A protein has these predicted regions:
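Patatin-like phospholipase
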Residues: 1-43, 51-393
Length: 393
């Protein structure tokens, strides 16, 4: 019997500046899932992260993202600069074609070993763009002259005009996002047969995936922050989101906005919750001409897990932290702890049949708050009897 070669798996890392910390969380999950690529392609920060992934420098990447700030990546004006000094700084940035990224270059110089990168078993490619004519350049390590890998990594991340173009052998290069922020085509050219793509929704051009290859797309439901604002707290949050989003993409957990246990007990609770929620909503509709308006319906529609959708939408609106792992029950407890109980109780007449027309109108005018009230009513009556308002996380 002929032995079949293993599927050539590729990890495709999009650009997105400071949002790149999200990709480190993805990497952590992929290692736990025992998913190992033979090919990695990246644009901009995706290329920088990808190089560290090729070198198996997870701890280095994690620690770097948890410590760097914007000032460690690019030259910035003094924090207490007066208006005159700020104007002078901005004039110089415009004159010099963007901010100086020497601090980032020093990090890349310290972290990345070109010889080790070339010797690694994972094939690696990046995208950059020649400034003249905006000519795209898709480059594998074999295409890059010896001693210039760091230069081309910096070129791929030269987010002009905010950052300076990178000059190599007399040619100026720009961020690869000017051509292809998600280099799936390059991955296929390098021999990929299966893709995992990590989208940061960064600026630039993201070409449609026309490879025809089996693809798992990983992107965050939540905002990941400004692309030029590097901050340890945001990085830590993004890593957790990336970790849980990857587990969800591979079917290990459920939910949409929140990481929810997919085990039997939690799933049974989710089924019971949704049935009870629908019953509460039906009861209110039968008493009053009040239903969820378009805004709240849209909020529910964004949630892909139908059973958990009302609970997740209410939890989001109440400000429940998305960086924790929950069961259906603990997510319910977190919502009850976070919601405005006085506001929730103000909707009680709608559920008891003693509401006025004004209260019904208020529910229609505040669809998200009314959705929270429906979830609150569901959880404090029959849905999950052991969950109480006093059990918040």
């Amino acid at each position: 019997m002929e032995r079949r070669e293993p599927t050539q798996k590729a990890l495709v890392l999009a650009g997105g500046g400071a949002r790149g910390s999200y990709q480190v969380g993805v990497w952590r999950a992929l290692m736990e899932l025992d998913w190992h690529p033979q090919i990695i392609t990246g644009t901009s920060v995706g290329g920088l992260n990808g190089a560290m992934f090729v070198l198996d420098l997870y701890e280095t990447a994690r620690d770097m993202w948890l410590t760097i700030r914007s000032r460690d990546v690019m030259e910035l004006p003094e924090e207490n600069a007066d208006l005159s000094a700020l104007h002078q700084f901005l004039r110089r940035v415009v004159k010099e074609g963007g901010m100086d990224v020497t601090p980032l270059e020093e990090i890349v110089e310290r972290v990345l070993d070109e010889d080790a990168l070339r010797a690694a078993p994972i094939r690696f490619g990046i995208v950059t763009v020649e400034q003249r004519g905006l000519r795209p350049r898709e480059l594998t390590l074999e295409d890059i002259p010896a001693g210039q890998v760091r230069d081309y990594l910096m070129a791929s991340a030269a987010c002009f005009p905010a950052l300076r173009a990178r000059q190599i052998d007399g040619v100026k290069f720009l961020d690869g996002g000017y051509s292809d922020n998600m280099p799936t085509g390059l991955a296929k050219t390098m021999g990929a047969e299966e893709l995992v793509c990590v989208d940061l929704e960064g600026v630039g051009i993201t070409l449609p995936n026309l490879t025809g290859l089996p693809t798992t797309m990983i992107r965050s439901y939540w905002e990941l922050g400004d692309i030029l604002h590097f901050d340890p707290d945001t990085a830590k949050r993004n890593m957790e989101l990336g970790y849980y989003d990857t587990l969800r993409a591979f079917g290990r957990i459920r939910g949409c906005a929140y990481a929810v246990d997919s085990g039997a007990d939690s799933s049974a609770d989710a089924e019971a919750f949704r049935a009870a929620f629908d019953a509460v909503q039906k009861e209110v509709r039968e008493k009053y001409p009040v239903t969820l308006t378009a805004d709240a319906a849209l909020l529910l529609a964004r949630m892909k897990d139908a059973q958990l959708a009302p609970l997740e939408a209410a939890a989001e609106d109440a400000g429940v932290d998305p960086t924790h792992f929950y069961t259906t029950r603990t997510l319910a407890e977190a919502f009850l702890a976070a919601c405005d109980k006085e506001r929730m109780e103000s909707f009680a007449p709608l559920f008891t049949g003693s509401s006025t027309a004004g209260q019904a109108a208020l529910a229609a005018l505040l669809p998200n708050t009314f959705l929270q009230a429906l979830v609150w009513r569901t959880l404090t009556t029959s849905a999950l009897p052991e969950v109480t308002e006093d059990e918040g996380l």
